[in-house]
Amino acid sequence: MRLRWTRLAEQDLDAIAQYIGQDSPPAAARVVLELIDQAETLLSGNPAIGRPGRVLGTRELVIGRLPYIIAYRVREDDLEILRVMHTSRAWPQEM
């Protein structure tokens, strides 16, 4: 299944990189690459792996080694990555 990252999800990755990069640019790169890798590896082969999402019609993949959740929506031909949220942030009402 093809993964498609929304503009908001890409902005989330950029914000994560900028925040972590203030202290350690190499760590920022590792975290962002790990998030992308986890999404592509886990979701492309098994889109139902995530739990039902808090927003209707979405699912959430909890990233085990990192404090992030990837919100996504399964479409007919692809999987849409909606957001990449830190677990301590308030969850949006809509995606």
PLM regions: where:
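Short, exposed beta-strand "edge-strand" segments with a Pro/Gly-rich flavor and a Y/T-containing core
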Residues: M1-W5, H86-R89
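Basic, Lys/Arg-enriched alpha-helical interface segments
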Residues: R2-T58, E94
